[in-house]
A protein has these predicted regions:
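A conserved short coil-to-beta-strand element within the FAD-binding core of flavoproteins
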Residues: 167-194
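C-terminal catalytic lobe of FAD-dependent flavoproteins
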Residues: 145, 153, 299-395
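Active-site substrate-recognition segment that forms the wall
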Residues: 16, 208-337
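Dinucleotide-binding Rossmann-like beta1-alpha1 core, especially the glycine-rich loop
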Residues: 46-131
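Beta1/beta-strand and adjacent pyrophosphate-binding region of the FAD-binding site
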Residues: 1-13
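Short hydrophobic core segments
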Residues: 6-8, 200-213
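Glycine-rich FAD pyrophosphate-binding loop
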Residues: 22-43
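Helix-loop-beta segment of a Rossmann-like dinucleotide-binding subdomain
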Residues: 126-170, 187, 200-203, 276-277, ...
């Protein structure tokens, strides 16, 4: 089957790119070895942030997420159906975020040189307008014009639009590259993970957008591994009778906690706790990490009742392109060799930028007839990865329990 492009990786970047190339008239399919969104996308905070800076727990100053001015508006327009991709079926967790500030001794929040000073685009809230979870916070509370998406809903939205172009593969036993030379792919031989049926794809361009799996894919086509490093995170989940909250706590210029909340399959409120504690927590066992987070939440959210909450944790090696101590995420990383393009690991909301970068380099479609998915009709399709708190075999506990072996060992998720 001749194609303009084959995409490896069904995360935010791969799906956005699939939409863009398809709309531009390319004959393109996307291959996924696990589930759509598995790894980084499904557990993403999915906050459509504006530019902000923080100091990381590893001591790297000014780690900055630099977001182009028009990118939040692009996402908003897509969610409203004003532009493509049409994301009108993507669910919002919240239409805004909140940020609250913990004052350090001797530091006045109102001081112009104070790193705790609220951002220019933030609306300071009077006590009566604060979310219930922030009612007793002593420092400033601000509202940020940053929407929060449900990544599972985003994936489902695009997957429904391009179902006939999504293929489930067996990357270990059912994938073989035929090369003309290193980095020059002539054909891709697939064997169905269900019944072993064969399929040969002959693309003009091969695109790796598989985050941590890019290294293995590049080796398979004779290329060196990209310059990227795993960033270990140990995230904590809490569920129960919790208030809805989406936002960040800032102390001494550092985002110490990020909370996103949702409702699970049984209508319980779930919090995912991220930030500095997740970066530091990879050294701790699950029960210790959950207890550490509980203590911190009690400190920064006075009045929050966590006595009946259930807890769980998971570890994730989030792939990031290697960088020095300067700004990070200020540009997308795209590497080209032969007819292989590799998209470096990218934060959720920057997926459109990777798409623009790759499509800007792509040749015009060379197949002029309409795309015919008939040869793919009987091929298995990838499912959508469950949200971390909806995983079937996830272990939960209360912090008053004696920790079991499961609670001592974090549940690990591939990046």
């Amino acid at each position: 089957m001749r194609l303009d492009a084959v995409i490896f990786g069904g995360g935010a970047t791969g799906l956005w790119l699939l939409d863009r190339l398809s709309r531009d008239g390319h004959h393109v399919v996307l291959l996924e070895a696990r589930s759509l969104g598995a790894g980084q996308t499904i557990g993403s905070q999915a906050i459509l942030r504006r530019s902000r800076s923080s100091t990381s727990s590893s001591g790297l100053a000014n780690r900055v997420l630099i977001v182009p001015h028009g990118l939040p508006s692009l996402w908003r327009d897509a969610l409203l159906g004003r532009i493509t991709p049409n994301l009108t079926h993507t669910r919002l967790r919240a239409d805004c975020c909140h940020q609250w500030y913990v004052e350090s001794a001797g530091l006045r929040v109102a001081s112009p040189d104070n790193p705790l000073r609220p951002r220019f685009d933030a609306e300071t809230l009077p006590p009566e307008e604060r979310p219930s979870a922030l009612a007793d916070v002593s420092g400033p509370v601000v509202r940020l014009p940053e929407q929060v998406l449900c990544p599972a809903s985003f994936i489902a939205d695009l997957a429904a639009q391009y179902h006939d172009r999504l293929l489930k593969i067996d990357a270990e036993r059912g994938l073989k590259f035929h090369l003309n030379s290193p980095g020059e792919v002539d054909a891709i031989q697939l064997a169905s993970p269900f019944d072993g049926q064969k399929l040969e794809l002959r693309p003009r361009q091969v695109i790796f957008a598989a985050d941590a799996d890019n290294a293995r894919l590049r080796r398979a086509v004779g290329l060196s591994e990209p310059m990227q490093s795993p960033r270990p995170l140990h995230r904590v989940l809490a569920r129960g009778r919790l208030p809805l909250l989406n936002g960040n706590c800032v102390e001494s210029g550092r985002t110490i906690v990020t909370v996103i909340s949702d409702v699970d399959a049984n209508e319980r409120t779930v919090w995912q706790i991220d930030g500095r504690l997740a970066e530091d927590g990879w050294k701790r066992e699950s029960y210790q990490q959950a207890e550490r987070v509980r203590q911190e939440l009690t400190r920064i959210l006075p009045g929050l009742n966590l006595t009946q909450a259930e807890w769980s944790t998971y570890e994730l090696d989030r792939a990031e392109c290697d960088a020095d101590t300067g700004p990070r995420h200020d540009a997308v990383s795209v590497f080209c060799a032969g007819n292989v393009t590799t998209a470096g690991p990218t934060p959720f909301m920057l997926a459109p930028l990777v798409s623009d970068e790759i499509t800007g380099r792509a040749s015009s479609p060379y197949i002029t007839t309409p795309f015919d998915p008939t040869p793919l009709a009987n091929w298995p399709r990838p499912s959508i990865a469950p949200l971390p708190w909806n995983e079937e075999h996830r272990t939960w506990w209360t912090l008053g329990d004696q920790p079991s072996k499961d609670q001592q060992q974090p549940q690990r998720r591939a990046a």
